[in-house]
């Protein structure tokens, strides 16, 4: 670290963001839109908001984060809506708490559009530079940054969003080089500065699969994965709802030849060869990890996904590896449909430095240095959506600190963003953290459809929701409220023609009369059925219809979940049997079984604070204890 007397500042900003990935862009845009002069520093102006791994946004829990960032006034949801190649709603056959929108995006278009947005944002300056040092004031508060080439910038707040670049090193087999990702140099020096300031740092690992030329693939032997015909949107802003031509993805599978190749050459992998001991992401394992951890599985699904409309590269999802390049081609050619493929880019593993986020407050400001914030992979997370969520929070709080306003803490009961940050700041997590629906005990309350209802008023309060968006929001909420009231108040008599038609269609009787809201509570009856019988409002938007139906149909489940939450709170001091066999409790996640068996907590409360043990696991554990109590002989 450097004192302000030892440097000459080239320029002055209120907030400086270090790194222009998905966390950095959200942080910089939030800060600038809230009126702070902001500098966004990046190692490469041509790789702003680059998607170095899978060019996709959304999926379970990640889509909820994306909707929430948009509801606050962020950009990632709009970006996915502007640049999608394919959209699909996952888990639609299940309850709305786990519905998950996923978009395959055009990698180059995504980066180009975001570059235009940040370059044209008022109050925001974008330039290249590698930050290696922090400039601190007399009270150990941040007052500036210094770059590798000795240029210094004064500021009141710094947000570190360094991704995989901090001490980054990529591996292919036993060959390695310093790099944040292929073709881009690593950020050196900043880790040493942070260590000198007393921060604990660690190493994590991730990886990306090879890219294949689509002209060399035989799609006729693969299973097509078509898009949904009815397009859905991440953003609550209709201004970005522009339908585009969609593309297919495809599915192939590993073969016995694939598995044999990997098993015979495990010793050549950076991890199994012993050259890398950093922890990788549990929920996005390399193909060699899958073969080892799931040795009983004869085959694994592999998804073949386009990286863009006008580029020939295919992303081979589920096939990341650190094995040698020559072996990678043999592995790829063992997959049906890729027997004659041309590999354009090899897969690689990347290890990098991170700061365990227990060193941050829930505002994402560090505890050691006033005015220093961290967001994204530097906090130990994995995924663009997790990064974007932290980025907008750090940007909001950095701006509020500059403006001498109270910084915000997002309660876990009110958003997935709050759940994410609470987990990061309170649990000692030593592997890359991915958001899962099971990590939230409030997931029935924290649905994608009501993200605007939960967070847009806050976005308006902090200055990220403009008058147009606010008008759209208030009109939508008024429409939903009015329609719910109409459905509760309107009764249908059993002799009405519409009632008789409904009985004939559904096979369920109507005795005397029934409210339209009670009709909607029936499991197989939906708002579209009301419309079919002339009982709905045709002018309602799909999002309004779905919100009305969900809030009426699942009201009882929501109340039950709230009671479960209260039960967990009461059960904190409940003792756990010393001889409990966690491996046999199938309702626990695999991660929870492993962590509980290793730590062997004494109480339910202690179990709930183990990293990787989610609230849903605690509910499963309580249910198991109740079952044990019922089956035990009465003494």
Swiss-Prot record:
Record's subunit section: Homodimer. Heterotetramer of two MnmE and two MnmG subunits.
GO terms for biological process, alphabetical: tRNA methylation; tRNA wobble uridine modification
GO terms for cellular component: cytoplasm
Cofactor(s) this protein cannot do without: FAD
One Pfam family from the record: GIDA_C_1st
A GO molecular-function descriptor: flavin adenine dinucleotide binding
Gene (UniProt): mnmG
Protein name: tRNA uridine 5-carboxymethylaminomethyl modification enzyme MnmG
Gene3D superfamilies: FAD/NAD(P)-binding domain, GidA associated domain, C-terminal subdomain, tRNA uridine 5-carboxymethylaminomethyl modification enzyme MnmG/GidA
Compartments, as annotated in UniProt: Cytoplasm
Organism expressing this protein natively: Acaryochloris marina (strain MBIC 11017)
Record has Transit peptide as a keyword: no
Superkingdom assignment: Bacteria
Alphabetized InterPro entries for the sequence: FAD/NAD-bd_sf (IPR036188), GIDA_C_N (IPR049312), MnmG (IPR004416), MnmG-rel (IPR002218), MnmG-rel_CS (IPR020595), MnmG_C (IPR026904), MnmG_C_subdom (IPR047001), MnmG_C_subdom_sf (IPR044920)
Positions with a binding annotation for NAD(+): 280-294
């Amino acid at each position: 670290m450097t004192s302000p007397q030892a440097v000459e500042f080239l320029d002055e900003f209120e907030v400086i963001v270090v790194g222009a990935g998905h966390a950095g862009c959200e942080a910089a845009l939030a800060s600038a839109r809230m009126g702070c002069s902001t500098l966004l520093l990046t190692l490469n102006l041509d790789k702003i908001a680059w998607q170095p791994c899978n060019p996709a946004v959304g999926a379970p829990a990640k889509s909820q984060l994306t909707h929430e960032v948009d509801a606050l006034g962020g950009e990632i949801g709009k970006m996915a809506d502007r640049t999608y190649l394919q959209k699909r709603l996952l888990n639609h056959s299940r309850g709305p708490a786990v519905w998950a929108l996923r978009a395959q995006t055009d990698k180059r278009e995504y980066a180009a559009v975001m570059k235009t947005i940040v370059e044209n944002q008022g109050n925001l300056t974008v330039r290249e530079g590698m930050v290696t040092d922090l400039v601190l004031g007399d009270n150990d508060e941040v007052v500036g940054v210094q770059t590798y080439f000795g240029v210094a910038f004064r500021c009141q707040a710094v947000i570190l969003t360094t991704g995989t670049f901090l001490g980054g090193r990529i591996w292919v087999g036993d060959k390695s080089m310093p790099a944040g990702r292929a073709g881009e140099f690593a950020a050196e020096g900043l880790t040493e500065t942070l260590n000198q300031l007393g921060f604990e740092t660690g190493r994590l690992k991730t990886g990306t699969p090879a890219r294949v030329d689509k002209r060399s693939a035989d799609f006729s032997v693969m299973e097509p994965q078509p898009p949904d015909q009815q397009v859905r949107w991440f953003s609550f802003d209709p201004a970005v709802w522009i339908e585009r031509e969609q593309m297919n993805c495809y599915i192939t599978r590993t073969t016995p030849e694939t598995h044999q190749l990997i098993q015979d050459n495990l010793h050549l992998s950076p991890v199994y060869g012993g050259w890398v001991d950093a922890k990788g992401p549990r929920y996005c394992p390399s193909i060699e990890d899958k073969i080892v951890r799931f040795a009983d599985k004869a085959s694994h699904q592999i998804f073949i996904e386009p990286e863009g409309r006008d580029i020939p590269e295919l992303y081979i999802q589920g096939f990341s590896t650190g094995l040698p390049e020559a072996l990678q081609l043999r592995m790829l050619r063992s997959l049906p449909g890729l027997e004659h493929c041309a590999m354009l880019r090899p897969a690689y593993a990347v290890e990098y430095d991170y700061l365990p986020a227990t060193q941050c407050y829930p505002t994402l400001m560090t505890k050691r240095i006033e005015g220093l914030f961290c967001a994204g992979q530097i906090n130990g997370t994995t995924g663009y959506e997790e990064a974007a969520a932290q980025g907008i929070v750090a940007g909001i709080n950095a701006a509020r600190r500059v403006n001498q306003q109270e910084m915000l803490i997002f309660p876990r009961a009110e958003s997935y963003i709050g759940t994410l940050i609470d987990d990061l700041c309170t649990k000692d997590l030593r592997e890359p953290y991915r958001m899962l629906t099971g990590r939230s005990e409030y997931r029935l309350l924290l649905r994608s459809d009501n993200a605007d209802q939960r967070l847009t008023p806050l976005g308006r309060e902090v200055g990220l929701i403009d008058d147009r968006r606010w008008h759209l929001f208030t009109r939508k909420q008024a429409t939903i409220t009015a329609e719910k009231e109409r459905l509760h108040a309107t009764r249908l008599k059993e002799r009405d023609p519409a009632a008789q038609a409904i009985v004939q269609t559904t096979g369920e009787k109507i005795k005397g009369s029934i409210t339209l809201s009670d009709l909607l509570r029936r499991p197989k009856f939906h708002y579209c059925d009301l419309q079919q019988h002339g009982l709905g409002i045709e002018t309602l938007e799909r999002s309004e219809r779905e919100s009305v139906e969900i809030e009426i149909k699942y009201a009882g489940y929501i109340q039950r979940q709230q009671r479960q939450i209260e039960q967990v709170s009461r059960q904190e001091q409940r003792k756990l049997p010393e001889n409990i066999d966690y491996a046999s409790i199938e309702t626990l996640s695999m991660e929870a079984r492993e962590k509980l068996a290793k730590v062997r907590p004494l109480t339910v409360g202690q179990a709930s604070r183990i990293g990787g043990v989610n609230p849903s696991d605690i509910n499963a554990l309580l249910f198991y204890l109740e079952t044990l109590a019922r089956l035990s002989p009465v003494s």
